A protein has these predicted regions:
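Beta-strand residues in well-ordered beta-sheet regions across diverse protein folds
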Residues: 47, 61-63, 163
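The feature marks short-to-medium sequence segments in extracytoplasmic or secretory-pathway proteins
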Residues: 54, 67-140, 185
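N-terminal low-complexity, Pro/Thr-rich disordered segments
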Residues: 1-38, 183-186
């Protein structure tokens, strides 16, 4: 990982107040949320039982159940990606889109008044930061269950909140929040 992520103390951070408003469904991580596509034909149910703390990072495994009319979800990455800036990555670096087009780079944690994106590394070939998460949610994934893995810098605390922002051009589609996710030590 690069200097863009710093190791933080793992003691609980003070509560900084309310979480930012979300435009999608909210539930505890273990209960999960069901998020419909913009057309409403497809939907994905997303759960996360816990995250695991290791050496200043948190590892999470999101369990997703896909329900698609045509037995595949051709745009599965939209439920997990960050497409706020066209042709760039979550850091806003030009050229980052090539490495992250179908990545799960929009899975953020909310802690201590901050939005924490996945940990990343500087890729020598792309010359841009690449997140430590699924990079290719393709080819089309058949209906059923799959696991999405992601690594975040550890903000400290005993629980975390996972938040996925809506894509600006899609309104509230694909937004959701999973709360009260327990942090387990490895």
């Amino acid at each position: 990982p690069t200097g863009g992520t710093t190791t933080k103390n793992t003691t609980p951070a003070p509560n900084s107040g309310k979480l930012p408003e979300t435009k999608g469904p909210v539930a505890k991580g273990t209960e999960g949320v069901t998020v419909k596509s913009d057309g409403g034909d497809d939907h994905v149910t997303i759960t996360i039982d816990h995250v695991t703390r290791q050496s200043g990072y948190l590892l999470g495994q999101l369990h997703t159940t896909i329900s698609a009319k045509k037995n595949s979800a051709p745009n599965l990455h939209l439920w997990f990606s960050d497409k706020e800036a066209v042709l760039s990555n979550s850091r806003g670096e030009d050229g980052g889109e090539e490495a992250t087009t179908y990545a799960a780079d929009g899975l953020t944690l909310l802690a201590g008044g901050e939005r924490i994106y996945p940990a990343d590394y500087l890729d020598a070939d792309f010359k841009t930061h690449v997140p430590l998460t699924e990079l290719a949610l393709t080819p089309f994934i058949k209906a059923g269950t799959t696991t999405i893995c992601v690594v975040w810098p550890d903000p400290g605390g005993d629980t975390v909140t996972l938040d996925h922002l809506p894509a600006a051009h899609l309104g509230s589609s694909f937004a959701y929040r999973l709360t009260d996710i327990p942090v387990k030590n490895s």
